[in-house]
């Protein structure tokens, strides 16, 4: 549980099995903590589109996000376009969303908000 520290400061933990799949009440608590992210696929994933001025900045964000994904051992699905990236998180090992998805979503948002790729 990450209630005592901000999501972007938390780290992913190994999560396997349906015991770690988040229920509706926990999703309702976590979703407001990651503004701009939306539930997708009937609550099985979260997504957000990040927009950039050009392809260079788009790929810079993708590369920085790949570093975060490697460090956290939790990897998003990405749709990479000239001026945007669609990021999708879901935890396959739990069959839906886990806390790890929200931790990484917060880290991705922080990366974008800090303008690391500008």
Swiss-Prot record:
Enzyme Commission code(s) on record: 4.2.1.96
Catalytic activity entry: (4aS,6R)-4a-hydroxy-L-erythro-5,6,7,8-tetrahydrobiopterin = (6R)-L-erythro-6,7-dihydrobiopterin + H2O
Database matches in SUPFAM superfamilies: PCD-like
One family name in Pfam for this protein: Pterin_4a
Molecular-function annotations in GO: 4-alpha-hydroxytetrahydrobiopterin dehydratase activity
InterPro entries according to UniProt: PCD_sf, Pterin_deHydtase
Keywords: Lyase
Gene3D superfamilies the record matches: Transcriptional coactivator/pterin dehydratase
Biological process according to GO: tetrahydrobiopterin biosynthetic process
Family matches, as HAMAP family: Pterin_4_alpha
Family stated for the protein in its record: Belongs to the pterin-4-alpha-carbinolamine dehydratase family.
PANTHER family in the record: PTERIN-4-ALPHA-CARBINOLAMINE DEHYDRATASE
Protein name: Putative pterin-4-alpha-carbinolamine dehydratase
Taxonomic lineage from the root: Bacteria, Pseudomonadati, Pseudomonadota, Gammaproteobacteria, Lysobacterales
């Amino acid at each position: 549980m990450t209630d005592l520290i901000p999501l972007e400061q938390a780290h992913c933990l190994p999560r396997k099995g349906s015991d770690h799949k988040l229920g509706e009440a926990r999703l309702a608590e976590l979703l407001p903590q990651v503004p701009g992210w939306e539930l997708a696929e009937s609550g099985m994933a979260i997504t957000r589109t990040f927009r950039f001025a050009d392809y260079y900045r788009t790929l810079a964000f993708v590369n920085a996000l790949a570093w975060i994904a490697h460090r956290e051992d939790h990897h998003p699905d990405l749709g990479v376009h000239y001026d945007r990236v669609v990021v999708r998180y879901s935890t396959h090992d739990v069959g839906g969303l886990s806390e790890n998805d929200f931790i990484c979503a917060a880290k991705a948002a922080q990366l974008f908000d800090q303008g690391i790729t500008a």
